[in-house]
Amino acid sequence: MMNRRARDWGLDCTHFASSHGLEDGNRSCARDLAVLTRLAMAEPRIRRIVRRRQVDFRFPIKGHRLYLYGHNPLIRMGYPGAIGLKTGYTFAAGRCFVGVVRRGGRTLGVVLLNSRDPAKHAPKLLDAAFARL
């Protein structure tokens, strides 16, 4: 089903071997991840989730809490206008990051694949892109 949906969306270099993406056989490219990002950010529920630095849940047993922390470097560093999205890592793909920033009525995204330092590279690319607008 996921692969059929990917084709429907025009994600020509994307193939899913699993829903979690951690095993061999999953693949994509920067263009497809950019398209998928645009589709995801059109969903209000997704936007609310990916902009958070952390989320905590209360467990019904003994009132304990579970804290989940996001790893989005733009959100963590307080990059101006950062509104989401997602980091990822596998041995095959290396460090990957997709980020979205809204500033001055414009929304830009950055896709980094196999990046040595997404926290360094993403802001530089976005700064350069916003400077050209």
Residue ranges of predicted features:
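Penicillin-recognizing serine hydrolase domain
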Residues: 1-133
